[in-house]
Amino acid sequence: MEKIDVLVVGCGISGISAAYHISKHCRGTTFAVLERRAKLGGTWSFFKYPGIRTDSDVFSFGFGWKRWESDNIVAPAKDICQYLDDAVDEHGLRQHIRLNTDVVSASFSSATQRWTVTTGAGGTIVCRFLILTTGYYQYEKPHMPAFGGSDRFQGTFVHSQQWPESLDVAGKRVIVIGSGATAVTMVPALIDRGAASVVMLQRSPSYYYVAPKHKKDRALSVLERLFGARIGYFLQKWLTILQGAVVYAYAQWFRAAAKQRFIAEARKLCPDHVDADTHFSPSYGVWDQRLCLDPDGSLFAALRTGRASVVTDHVARFVESGVCTGGGEVLEADIVVSATGLTLQHNFPMSTMKVSVDGVPYDAPNHFVFRGCMLSGVPNLFYILGYTNASWTLRADMMARYFCDMINYLGRHGMGMLCPCADGVEESQAVPFNLRLSRHGFTLAAWASPPLERNDPSPP
């Protein structure tokens, strides 16, 4: 049996951020980070589909404590993984990380004020605090709609979350079902890999924010020349964050104007044979769903090649040669990719762990969320989620620091346990836990997640 102060479960962006802040702001605190996979990095080392990259700029995506050195403002997954590896090594965190170690169960005892955690290998770790940084979706189960007749298709049918690295698209006809961040990333990448044709088959359009791919712009050069590399980079980071906040606020306050602006931009970028009003005019408002980043307008550039196209219709059924749309059109393909999103964790945020407090199993709907990082009736447990309308890392860094402040406060006052209490909170005061966006996968999992206390100032 091993005894430590803090156990972090998950070694993606949030887990690495938590490890850094504990090592820096909680001196003398013993901790470990468990990762069930053989490689750290979370999403960025797990997904393998062509073109996988950030859907936000690297200034805001990078940690506040680690400068991003790559030349691209939009980074591919391999650069992100290298960045995370460098961050871990530069700050001496690798000694605390244990790969290939999953957590089966965790039980809290109020008598001892400790968590007892059991790993898949049968090991036991006793800790004071448990931090969950396992994300929000299921790794093993992507969101796959029930497409009729998919077993009849004679070609290759894959989900983007389960992309086989050996799959060769050169000379092949490809259909990508979906129009979100994954689809807008894959379509240009598939063209670059030599696909004969790529059809983006979307049930409904999305908004695309076109931004430059390279960060060596005039603003950064001027700031670094005036204030030096470190301060100039810091200023550029916050200017970029402010720009994103302004775009989001504009979309919320001036909904009609924001919608028309994005549609007008799509009209300018579309080639003549693509009808922007049909394929790039969503029925919802800007930022009602996450905005898709299109670096250098690569999706529109792919459309201009004539090898990529967009079809706006639903999938009626699969046929032997491809997909039949609701309008009766048969789209022939050698490869069909379902880029239809993620399946959220059930019993969030416990992932696949069995969790109990004093012998009572955790059941999400019976708990309230406190400040977007704790759960009522579950002592000494924190979870970390990023933003849905900005870079994930910004909130992950902030919540990791908040955790450190809380355990330091407990230490200064001789306390051993912290537990949000829902006493006095009526059922009518609860609001659904929904990550603020209406994306299909988020709303599907709302029933399996704890409600928010209506007066909670910090929902996720």
For each predicted feature, which ranges?
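Feature captures the FAD/FMN-dependent oxidoreductase FAD-binding
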Residues: 71-138, 317
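Rossmann-like dinucleotide-binding core of oxidoreductases
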Residues: 3, 7-8, 13, 17-33, ...
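Glycine/threonine-rich phosphate-binding loop and adjacent beta-strand/alpha-helix elements that clamp
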Residues: 49, 197, 335, 339-410
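Glycine-rich beta-alpha-beta "Rossmann" dinucleotide-binding loop(s) and their flanking helix/strand
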Residues: 130-161, 193, 305, 331-364
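Short beta-strand to alpha-helix junction loop
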Residues: 68-86, 98, 177, 250-259, ...
